[in-house]
Amino acid sequence: MADLLRNQPIPSKERLNTMTRTVVESKTKTAIIGFDEPFCVIGERINPTGRKILAEELERGDFSRVEADAIAQAAAGANILDVNSGAVFSNKMAEDPRYADNNFVEPMLMPELIRVVQNAVDIPICIDSSVPGALEAGLEACEGRPLLNSVTGEEERLELVLPLVKKYNVPVVAISNDDTGISEDPDVRFEVAKKIVERAADFGIPAHDIVVDPLVMPIGAMATAGHQVFTLVRRLREELGVNTTCGASNISFGLPNRHGINNAFLPMAMGAGMTSAIMNPITLAVNPTKIAEKKAELVAAGIILPDEIDDETFVTLLGMGSTKPTPGKEMEAIRAANFLFDRDPHGTEWIKFNKVAPKAGQEGRGRAGRKGGRRR
């Protein structure tokens, strides 16, 4: 099968666009990752790795933050939600040594996470774990056709994950590292991706069900990181005919004003042919403590605040953000790029995203609160 793949003629651009559509489904909704499709946003927030409070809540059986994160990301425009089960249960570990092993914890936790997310929102899921048992437990619990995250070029991982991809007929994220680790050489990363596509073909898995992560390096540590990934994405598209994804925020790691870097990187990656990203689609709500501190600061400066001012009005007036999660600036950049690349016909999504809800009493009025009607 791999030899057949190697000998196939390169398809035309039009045929390539039609062929390379990765279909991910929930029970009721479909997300398509493709060269001629709007950019696919995979929300990353349901991940206890590095989120101590979330991990502690999950250990107590409290899934309220997972539900809230799912709803907020879907509302912000995420097309797929990544669900990661990599939690460390420190308290249970002290009582039962089995909890020190992720191979014990994650196969139990993953189905619970998926059930909570599926009950909260109706968009497709990306099952994310380094534990094959957790991946299969997630596949059993998931409705529709989820995206599996992930396989690598490591021999053991290939032999464990690709049979699951074939058995459940699902697409998979392929990360471009192998048994030698992560190479800084983009040519090596391309060869790893090619190896995964060829091995997948041996299992009867088509290239359109492989979504390659070419591994975005931090530009603060490697000045050529951006240029490398753009070149690599073009090669993956033209030579292997696969869709691509990345951890978008990796590019700005360790830098000030990370949103500024991310906002530039994402449209440029889209222009190079990247078709999806695993990213945070929301701007977090302003912390109540910060609101209280700012109010105290203003009062100390002799500024009198109206008694009737609510927190949302307060933070809006001061440019602090919102008391509710809102779509992040990266989502604005992606929607603009979709429009500019002709993946948003007539700018429908751009207009909907930027439409300001009328204030109370202003419904049905034109600009500046005028009543509708022809100017005389």
Model region roles, listed by residue range:
Residues 1-211, 217-376:
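Domain-level signal for soluble alpha/beta catalytic cores
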